[in-house]
């Protein structure tokens, strides 16, 4: 099991790289994360919902993702509550205290999934969540040491040196663990190092002397990996240069599936800017309203920041606008939540650019899809994750024609606005090229983002092989008993 001293220490990436190394060696390996809290999710072939990190790790292992790889997914919809998804299916919304009481049920699902994976594969690489040192969350823990103790699983601890204080993080984490949990930690990996390794060596020697545990390696800071982020929104401007399409995406408080824009970030003809609160929307050729876990609250927040007026101004000057999933729902005339699925029952005026209304409903739509853009026929593949039913005249001009005979979304009569429920809209090469051309790119080029992701997994595995003592690390993770 790989645990981290903090969130974003590198657990997901390390597990993905180790999965690829094991897969290369012919080992039947599967990833597993007992509990994930994230708004970035993926859809399995059978219509289940799991964290995107586990879908990426499955790809690294040469597998199709399954719900057993992430049996518990928590999707925050407020500061104190989340939608609880067990084995890929929503079980309802719970606040933090109610979920604490629910944990024995969640743990049963976790152990059942882990048992099935253990029976099918030679090696199951487990990823923890956050940090095992959160002493206030130790009771009924199912994500870190609580799980490791339940299945007698050895643990490697990873820490991010780039944020500073790496030795305090590692030694402090051990100090917060019980004696049996400390004994379970077999060693350390230090991530995101930049500089002269010889200057770090005295610290590594001190760490081993203090703890009696080895450092399995120091990983360099890797730039340019095209791998799905667990949840943190990447707000840095993309590195495109020359004449490019200026794309602006408002960072909503409950933004979901911002991995939709990874393919755009990697495209040499696109400059992506994620705009946070308190900042004006800069001049753009294309504005994209992203998915949201709390559409009405995020729409109210968007208005409170004056971004509705900025979008109207953008359209007056000829800019293009795309709404994806929750962003699509915002573009209609009205949003209705009669059952209070996102809070109090009620309704809210949409931005009014497309003639349709959306009513939130309990049944969640979860499916992988293939189809073509309605205008031009470029092939695409994506997935649906939404609880809304959208109806209205605007849907007579669909954005997408699906292979199963359905249509999706809408395009405005003037062709300036496109709305769709589909995530992964820019991942397919031809669809990405067609959408960039629609948005104003002359001689738009296709880019195979799936190939970029696969090349990144290979580069990651090569880096781990060069910088880790893999025989010692894998030996330390050998199944006990």
Swiss-Prot record:
Ligase as UniProt keyword: no
GO biological process, one term: cobalamin biosynthetic process
Catalytic residue list: 325 (nucleophile), 423
MF terms in GO: ABC-type vitamin B12 transporter activity; catalytic activity
Keywords on record: Cobalamin biosynthesis, Glutamine amidotransferase
InterPro entries: Class_I_gatase-like, CobQ/CobB/MinD/ParA_Nub-bd_dom, CobQ_GATase1, CobQ_N, CobQ_synth, GATase_3, P-loop_NTPase
Highest taxon of the lineage: Bacteria
Keyword set includes Calcium: no
Metabolic or biological pathway, per its Swiss-Prot or TrEMBL entry: Cofactor biosynthesis; adenosylcobalamin biosynthesis
Domain GATase cobBQ-type: start-end pairs: 244-431
Pfam families: CbiA, GATase_3
Record NCBIfam families: cobQ (TIGR00313), PRK00784.1 (NF001989)
Function: Catalyzes amidations at positions B, D, E, and G on adenosylcobyrinic A,C-diamide. NH(2) groups are provided by glutamine, and one molecule of ATP is hydrogenolyzed for each amidation.
Protein family (similarity comment): Belongs to the CobB/CobQ family. CobQ subfamily.
Name of the protein in question: Cobyric acid synthase
Organism: Ralstonia nicotianae (strain ATCC BAA-1114 / GMI1000)
Name of the gene: cobQ
């Amino acid at each position: 099991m790989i645990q981290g001293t903090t969130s974003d220490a590198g657990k997901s990436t390390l597990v993905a790289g180790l999965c690829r190394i094991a897969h290369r060696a012919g080992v039947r390996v599967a990833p597993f994360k007992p509990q994930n809290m994230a708004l970035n999710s993926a859809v399995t072939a059978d219509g289940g919902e799991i964290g995107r990190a586990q879908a990426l790790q499955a790809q690294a292992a040469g597998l199709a993702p399954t719900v057993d790889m992430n049996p518990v997914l928590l999707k925050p919809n407020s500061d104190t509550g989340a939608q609880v998804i067990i084995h890929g299916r929503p079980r309802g919304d719970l606040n933090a205290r109610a979920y604490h009481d629910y944990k024995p049920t969640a743990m049963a699902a976790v152990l059942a999934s882990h048992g099935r994976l253990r029976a099918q594969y030679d090696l199951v690489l487990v990823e923890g969540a956050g940090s095992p040192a959160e002493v206030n969350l130790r009771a009924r823990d199912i994500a870190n040491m609580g799980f490791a103790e339940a299945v007698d699983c050895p643990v490697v601890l990873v820490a991010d040196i780039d944020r500073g204080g790496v030795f305090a993080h590692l030694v402090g984490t051990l100090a917060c663990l019980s004696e049996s949990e400390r004994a379970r930690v077999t060693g350390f990996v230090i991530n995101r190092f930049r500089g002269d390794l010889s200057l770090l060596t005295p610290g590594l020697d001190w760490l081993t002397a203090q703890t009696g545990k080895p450092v399995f390696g120091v990983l360099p800071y890797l730039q340019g990996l095209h791998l799905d982020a667990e949840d943190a929104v990447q707000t840095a401007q993309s590195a495109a240069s020359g004449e490019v399409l200026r794309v602006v995406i408002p960072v909503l408080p409950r933004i979901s599936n911002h991995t939709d824009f990874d393919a755009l970030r990697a495209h040499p003809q696109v400059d992506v800017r994620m705009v946070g609160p308190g900042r004006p929307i800069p001049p753009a050729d294309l504005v994209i309203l992203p998915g949201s876990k709390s559409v009405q609250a995020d729409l109210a927040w968007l208005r409170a920041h004056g971004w509705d007026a900025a979008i109207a101004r953008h359209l007056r000057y000829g800019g293009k606008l795309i709404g994806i999933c929750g962003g699509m729902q915002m573009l209609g005339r009205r949003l209705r939540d009669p059952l209070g699925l996102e809070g109090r029952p009620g309704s809210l005026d949409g931005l009014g650019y497309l003639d349709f209304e959306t009513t939130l409903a309990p049944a969640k739509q979860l499916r992988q899809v293939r189809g073509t853009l309605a205008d031009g026929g470029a092939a695409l593949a994506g997935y649906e994750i939404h609880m809304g039913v959208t109806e209205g005249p605007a849907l007579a001009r669909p954005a997408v024609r699906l292979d199963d005979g359905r249509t999706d979304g809408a395009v405005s009569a003037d062709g300036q606005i496109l709305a769709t429920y589909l995530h992964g809209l820019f991942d397919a090469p031809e669809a990405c090229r067609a959408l960039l051309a629609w948005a104003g790119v002359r001689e738009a080029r296709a880019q195979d983002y799936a190939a970029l992701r696969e090349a990144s997994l290979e580069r990651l595995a090569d880096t781990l092989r060069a910088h880790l003592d893999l025989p010692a690390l894998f030996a330390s993770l050998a199944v006990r008993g």
